[in-house]
C-alpha cells in the first residue's frame, strides 16, 4: 500500500445495557481488524443502534458498521419485538446507505445474570465479534472486486 492509500475504517456501536458482555464483541472484532482502524460508539440500548448505524454508514467514513447488543427478557415487555425492530433497522440502514451494517445483536432464549450465564455469553460475544469482523472484511473485499 502506498502513502496515497489509506486503511479502511470501521464503526463499532455497542449498547450500554449488559456492557460487560457487549464490550466483549468489540474485543473479538479487534482481534481481526486492528483497533486503530475502528471507531467505537456507545448507545444507551439496542433500540438506539439502527439510527446511529444509518448515520455512520451515510457519513462515507466507514467501510462497514457493526452493532452489538444483548436483548434479554426482562419480564416487563416482549423483548422479541425490540430484537426484531433492531435487526430490521440495522438491515434497513445497510440497504439504504449501501454500506454493510452487521448485527451482533443477540437475543437468547434464556438469560439469567448468574456467573455461569455471564461467562457463557461473554465468550460467545467474543466469537460473534470475530465473525462480524470477518464478514466486514469479506463483504467489503467482494464489493470492491465488483466495482473494479
Can you annotate each of these PLM segments?
Residues 2-42:
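Glycine-rich phosphate/diphosphate-binding loop of Rossmann-like nucleotide-binding domains
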Residues 16-17, 43, 69-71, 106-111:
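Short, ordered loop/turn segments at secondary-structure junctions
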Residues 24, 28, 89-92, 131, ...:
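Alpha-helical scaffold segments in soluble metabolic enzymes
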Residues 32-59:
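Active-site rim loops that border cofactor/substrate pockets in soluble metabolic enzymes
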Residues 52-90, 94:
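Glycine-rich phosphate-binding loop
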Residues 82-108, 127:
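Short, acidic/small-residue loops that bind anionic groups at enzyme active sites
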Residues 109-127:
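Phosphate-binding/catalytic loops
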Residues 123-148:
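A charged, well-structured terminal subsegment
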Amino acid at each position: 500500500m502506498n502513502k496515497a492509500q489509506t486503511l479502511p475504517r470501521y464503526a463499532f456501536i455497542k449498547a450500554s445495557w449488559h456492557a460487560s458482555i457487549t464490550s466483549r464483541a468489540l474485543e473479538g472484532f479487534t482481534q481481526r481488524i486492528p483497533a486503530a482502524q475502528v471507531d467505537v460508539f456507545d448507545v444507551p440500548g439496542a433500540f438506539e443502534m439502527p439510527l446511529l448505524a444509518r448515520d455512520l454508514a451515510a457519513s462515507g467514513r466507514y467501510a462497514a458498521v457493526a452493532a452489538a447488543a444483548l436483548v434479554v427478557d426482562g419480564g416487563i415487555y416482549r423483548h422479541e419485538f425490540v430484537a426484531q425492530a433492531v435487526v430490521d433497522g440495522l438491515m434497513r440502514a445497510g440497504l439504504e446507505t449501501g454500506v454493510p451494517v452487521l448485527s451482533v445483536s443477540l437475543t437468547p432464549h434464556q438469560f439469567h445474570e448468574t456467573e455461569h450465564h455471564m461467562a457463557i455469553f461473554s465468550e460467545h460475544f467474543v466469537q460473534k465479534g470475530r465473525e462480524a469482523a470477518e464478514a466486514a472484511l469479506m463483504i467489503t473485499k467482494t464489493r470492491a472486486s465488483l466495482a473494479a
